[in-house]
């Protein structure tokens, strides 16, 4: 998992895909135009980071434990995206969607599991005043199970999956763009195959 040959790209390709999917869904899944990326494996290469558990991992560590991307999307949307497995911080912070008619604060969460532990907050102008209100968090213990069941049902019955393949391609094109940009030090061409 931590070796380049078998682990791929690290945190961006692992937990980054879930956070990126959440943000792209919130803005309508536009196609990427350009991506500038940065990756680092600094903490993963430090023996002291592992305490006494597995210091030998530092020598094997070959994937990024931190990645950041600045993504320009269709429709004039810009995404400032960061993800990390390891950092000297408790969180990289809340996700902020800043629109022309309002904003949305999405609390830092382990969004891979399909739910939020805290409510999201909407900010907007009403009658000339800035207001904010929380969106209630739906109570459910089985969001992840629902995702898996939906996928299995689509495969068994030949139906449409809840996540279109076009979204998976956009998500992966952005991740690939961030990793390539970090490797070459400039913006690569982003190509999203048509489905």
Language-model segments: residues:
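Solvent-exposed beta-strand sheet faces enriched in polar/charged residues
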Residues: 36-38, 82, 191
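Predominantly a Rossmann-like dinucleotide-binding segment in NAD(P)-dependent oxidoreductases
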Residues: 1-60, 185
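C-terminal helix-rich "cap/oligomerization" subdomain common to oxidoreductases
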Residues: 74, 120, 127-128, 136, ...
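Conserved glycosyltransferase catalytic-site signature
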Residues: 20, 64-67, 172
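NAD(P)-dinucleotide binding in Rossmann-like oxidoreductases
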Residues: 46, 57-67, 72-147, 164
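A general structural signal for well-ordered alpha-helical segments in protein cores
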Residues: 19-20, 145-149, 175-176
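A generic structural signal for residues located within well-ordered alpha-helices
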Residues: 15-18, 146, 166, 170
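Phosphate/oxyanion-binding loops and surfaces in catalytic or ligand/nucleic-acid-binding neighborhoods
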Residues: 25-30, 103-104, 178-181
């Amino acid at each position: 998992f931590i070796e380049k040959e078998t682990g791929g790209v690290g945190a961006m390709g692992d937990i980054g895909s879930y956070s990126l999917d959440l943000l792209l869904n919130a803005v309508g899944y536009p196609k990427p135009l350009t991506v500038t990326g940065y990756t680092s494996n600094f903490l993963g290469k430090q023996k002291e980071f592992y305490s006494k558990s597995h210091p030998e991992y530092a020598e094997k560590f070959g994937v990024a434990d931190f990645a950041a991307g600045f993504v320009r999307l269709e429709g004039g949307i810009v995404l400032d995206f960061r993800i990390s497995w390891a950092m000297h911080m408790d969180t990289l912070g809340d996700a902020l969607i800043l629109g022309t008619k309002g904003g949305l604060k999405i609390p830092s969460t382990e969004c891979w599991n399909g739910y939020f532990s805290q409510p999201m907050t909407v900010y907007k102008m009403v009658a000339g005043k800035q207001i904010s209100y929380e969106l209630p968090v739906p109570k459910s213990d089985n969001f992840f199970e629902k995702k898996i069941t939906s996928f299995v049902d689509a495969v068994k019955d030949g139906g449409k999956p809840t996540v279109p393949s076009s979204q998976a391609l956009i998500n992966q094109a952005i991740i690939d763009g961030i990793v390539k940009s970090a490797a070459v030090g400039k913006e690569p061409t982003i190509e999203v195959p048509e489905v």
